[in-house]
Amino acid sequence: MERAPALAEPEPRVQSLPMVKALNAGLRQALVADPKVLILGEDVGPLGGVFRVTEGLQSEFGASRVVDTPLAEAGIVGTAIGLAMRGYRPVVEIQFNGFVFPGFDQITTQLAKMANRHSGAVSMPVVIRIPHGGHIGAVEHHQEAPEAYFAHTAGLRIVAPSTPHDAYWMIQEAIASDDPVIFFEPMSRYWPKGEVDTLENPLPLHASRIVRSGTDATIVAWAGMVPVALRAAEIAAEEGRSLEVVDLRSLAPIDYAPVLRSVQKTGRLVVAQEAPGIVSVGSEVAAVVGEKAFYSLEAPVLRVAGFDTPFPPAKLESLYLPDADRILEVVDRSLAY
């Protein structure tokens, strides 16, 4: 009697994955679920992208769905816009954050405005994936945080996961959206592993979340600054201070409800970001909290940010980017009021 073939072991519901693998799995799920989903970008095919986020996808789904493009960001974004008008759901990969600017005109004057221009008769289900932030020891154009440019542009949704679990689910939700989504991926979080629950997604795409409870002050952060803020909270706890940390997750729109609840409890707010502080997402958060929670504040809203200078050479990166010590220094100023 022939032995029955062994059944393949099902993948575990909860897996420990780095963000690059979580994104890869999320993209694969989207490609399987909808034949209209396409991936476009430089070296996204056999190479799998600079960070290997698309590794193996072209061999599985073919070169007509995972498309290697020329080095021409304006052309890549423009092609994605045309594909969206024909009913496709293109996902564009930008190799590094500074490389998005050659495509900036297409994003801000066409992609963001197309649906409004046609009174809603045309939708723009385009996702633009952009590596975000620093902590990788690179040079200018490779580790900047350009979210404020896009957050100021009406018509774009902007998200920035900080964990592999969020990355897995948020990339799928972004692809399912009928609006254009700028999807920032913190490079400092690409490789550390985290638990990914592939069956349960507890939060909608644009929900912010309290990731650590506290009573003395609130820290708001996003993307690669979330683990830095959590580290600051751990150090503070050892010194007898209780800090609450809120992960925004979405930068446009911003879900302020958890932020305001937290500030009403703690009476103090510190906003931490990698980008320069001037005219930034952090500026907006500070302004809105000042408007909506003024009578709950025991101290001015304070910010920790990258300096208002061009990004420095790699060896000076650690001096430029906020770390736990800089966050705690500002927290101490807040608590001193």
Swiss-Prot record:
GO terms for molecular function: magnesium ion binding; pyruvate dehydrogenase (acetyl-transferring) activity. Its EC number is 1.2.4.1. The pyruvate dehydrogenase complex catalyzes the overall conversion of pyruvate to acetyl-CoA and CO(2). It contains multiple copies of three enzymatic components: pyruvate dehydrogenase (E1), dihydrolipoamide acetyltransferase (E2) and lipoamide dehydrogenase (E3). This is Pyruvate dehydrogenase E1 component subunit beta. It catalyses: N(6)-[(R)-lipoyl]-L-lysyl-[protein] + pyruvate + H(+) = N(6)-[(R)-S(8)-acetyldihydrolipoyl]-L-lysyl-[protein] + CO2. Keywords: Oxidoreductase, Pyruvate, Thiamine pyrophosphate. It comes from the Bacteria. PANTHER family: PYRUVATE DEHYDROGENASE E1 COMPONENT BETA SUBUNIT (PTHR43257), PYRUVATE DEHYDROGENASE E1 COMPONENT SUBUNIT BETA (PTHR43257:SF2). The keyword Chloroplast does not apply. The keyword Amino-acid biosynthesis does not apply. It comes from Leifsonia xyli subsp. xyli (strain CTCB07). Its cofactor is thiamine diphosphate. Pfam families: Transket_pyr, Transketolase_C. InterPro entries: THDP-binding (IPR029061), Transketo_C/PFOR_II (IPR009014), Transketolase-like_Pyr-bd (IPR005475), Transketolase_C (IPR033248). Thiamine diphosphate binds at E73. Heterodimer of an alpha and a beta chain.
